[in-house]
Amino acid sequence: MIPGEFYISHGNIELNVGRQQVLVTIINTGDRPIQIGSHFHFYEVNSALKFNRVITRGFRLNIPSGTAIRFEPGQFRTVELVKYAGACKIYGFCKAIMGKLD
């Protein structure tokens, strides 16, 4: 085995099966692009992104780990979010939660 090498199964790999998901339409009202990573708590993203923030509490982008989505100034975009799993403790980000979600 080579350090960092992966052995991936053949076929499709399904992500986040059975987790609650929500579609959200967003507009970037700022004058600069905003990029959001795969595991950032969407409720706490840059305030220049306008959307129904309340429904995004406890959700993140439903995209592969380590990737991101970029929102250009003035751009409308609909994205799919997925509910966090596990202990659902949120720390850091913009410090809006700092503990258990429920």
Swiss-Prot record:
Q: What is its EC number?
A: 3.5.1.5
Reactions that this protein is recorded to catalyse: urea + 2 H2O + H(+) = hydrogencarbonate + 2 NH4(+)
Q: Which Pfam families match?
A: Urease_beta
Intracellular or extracellular location(s): Cytoplasm
| CDD domains on file | Urease_beta
Q: Which GO terms describe its cellular component?
A: urease complex
Pathway listed for it?
Nitrogen metabolism; urea degradation; CO(2) and NH(3) from urea (urease route): step 1/1
Enzyme's top EC category: hydrolase
Assembly: Heterotrimer of UreA (gamma), UreB (beta) and UreC (alpha) subunits. Three heterotrimers associate to form the active enzyme.
By sequence similarity, the record places it as follows: Belongs to the urease beta subunit family.
Protein name per Swiss-Prot or TrEMBL = Urease subunit beta
